[in-house]
Amino acid sequence: MVLGLAQYGVIDLHLHLDGSLSPAWMIEWAKKQAVNLPASTAEALTAYVSVPQDCSDLNEYLRCFDLPLSLLQTPEALSSAVTDLIQRLDQDGLVYAEIRFAPQLHTQRSMSQEDAVKAALRGLQAGLASTSLFKANLILCCMRAADNRSANLETICLAKQYLTKYEAGVVAIDLAGAEGLFATQHFQQEFDFANQRGVPFTIHAGEAAGPESVQQALDFGATRIGHGIRAIESETVMKQLIDKRTPLEMCPCSNLQTKTVAQLADYPLRTFLMRGVVATLNTDNMTVSQTCIQQEYRLLAEQYQLSISEAKQLLLNSIAAAFLSNEDKKALLAHIQQRYPQLI
């Protein structure tokens, strides 16, 4: 049963590039860029780029990203990282993924935000050309900070410039970062700007802040919600999620580590599914959380008694929630049915 449910892990819609670099890749590219690392082996390095068992909250969790980001400041490194991630996803048997990153975090040296987007797109195309994935796409993250509105607006302009509907490429924007420190309500200007330009978006909300953050994201017009766990605390928000069919990108391992939920028994996934919320299952950060999409399903099978019907619903929800055209969603379903006929 457990192995069977792990097989449902073939789509990941909430996957951060900088939180999913392999230690082996980091060692290779640290040498190429003359960056000193705190450890010389992949096993030893993992301790520095993954969350500790006693992680206190999301803010501590986010500190694990400093080292990986330091290695992603050249076009060559950024392209290679995207390609490497896609190849690892392919080895894990995935068929579709949406990889997200914040262009503004890759400008510490000489790259512009547009340079970063172009580099990631090159890596995306190279990765897809060398794998059997149905497709992969990119989501550009705006960041929660006190004084970076101009950088966020630039990210949105780039998303509009490179937005694609049918070819693999940029499909949406996101708002990521320390939700508890920088409330969602302060970013209305960014999402008004995105709406005016027809750029779809997901927003991290209801992770380190309460249901009011999810409400704000819905009011802004979010197509999806990243995490959204604390929506369960408000019947008003729950009803909107159900009525609007707004998908939630849920990431159990990460949510446990950031103390969004104290224990898996408290996880609201089953309630969401039973009430008709379009919940999906994702990894968040493969390296920081030491997980993969199959591990997320395995965890829920072993400790949450996830059923086959629930696993199947999560997979169907992921197809429906993907930033894909309706034609591509039908093609993705057909691809899964042909490649993994036992799943659907």
Swiss-Prot record:
One of its GO terms (molecular function) is adenosine deaminase activity. Keywords: Hydrolase, Metal-binding, Nucleotide metabolism, Zinc. One of its GO terms (cellular component) is cytosol. Zn(2+) binds at residues 14, 16, 204, 284. It comes from the Bacteria. Substrate binds at residues 16, 18, 177. Binds 1 zinc ion per subunit. GO terms for biological process: adenosine catabolic process; hypoxanthine salvage; inosine biosynthetic process; nucleotide metabolic process; purine ribonucleoside monophosphate biosynthetic process. It is an enzyme of class 3 (hydrolase). The record marks 227 as: Important for catalytic activity. Pfam families: A_deaminase (PF00962). The active site is at 207 (proton donor). Its EC number is 3.5.4.4. Its cofactor is Zn(2+). It catalyses: adenosine + H2O + H(+) = inosine + NH4(+); 2'-deoxyadenosine + H2O + H(+) = 2'-deoxyinosine + NH4(+). Catalyzes the hydrolytic deamination of adenosine and 2-deoxyadenosine. Belongs to the metallo-dependent hydrolases superfamily. Adenosine and AMP deaminases family. Adenosine deaminase subfamily. HAMAP family: A_deaminase. This is Adenosine deaminase. It comes from Haemophilus ducreyi (strain 35000HP / ATCC 700724).
